[in-house]
A protein has these predicted regions:
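A short gly/proline-enriched turn/hairpin at secondary-structure junctions
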Residues: 55, 61-72, 86-90
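Short beta-strand edge/turn micro-motifs at domain boundaries
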Residues: 127-152
């Protein structure tokens, strides 16, 4: 009985060790996720909405929560951004992400908290908080869920 218990305990320990990420993998994942966000920020500041959207999972399963509304799908999210920031009478402004806290949930998932700040041509400065869920796909890290809330 003791032998069986020892074997089972060893197998559990081996499986747990195999599933845990190395510190390097965790740091590499965090850097890759931050790179996606910086690439999005740069694309936004070039008024490149398609480049900004490249950071999102191009799937009907993408979810976006903001302003008390729930949006589903990459195309619907793009349409929302276009209507609010890239249509006549609406400007994209300059975007800055700050206070990023990236937590790896595994080797292929991450949770991000942060702040956004927009500086608009008319001098207004919308800002707020966001939480993001990232997943790692064959083509890289993508946002699969975005919850953004603007400050009042």
């Amino acid at each position: 009985m003791k032998t069986r218990f020892s074997v089972v305990a060893c197998l559990i320990a081996i499986c747990a060790a195999a599933q845990s990420s190395s510190p390097y993998a965790s740091e590499a994942g965090k850097a890759a996720v931050e790179h996606v966000l910086r690439t999005q920020q740069d694309a936004w500041n070039r008024h490149d909405l398609d480049g900004f959207m490249a950071g999102y999972w191009n799937s009907p399963e993408l979810t976006f929560f903001s302003g008390g509304q729930e949006q589903h799908g990459w195309q619907a999210t793009l349409d929302r951004y276009r209507a609010r920031y890239a249509s006549p009478g609406h400007e994209m402004g300059k975007l800055e992400f700050s206070a990023l806290r990236i937590e790896m949930l595994g080797s292929d998932a991450a949770f991000v908290r942060g702040e956004f700040h927009l500086t608009m041509p008319d001098g207004k400065t919308p800002h707020g908080l966001f939480t993001l869920v990232f997943r790692k796909f064959v083509d890289g890290w993508k946002i699969v869920h975005d919850h953004t809330s603007a400050a009042e």
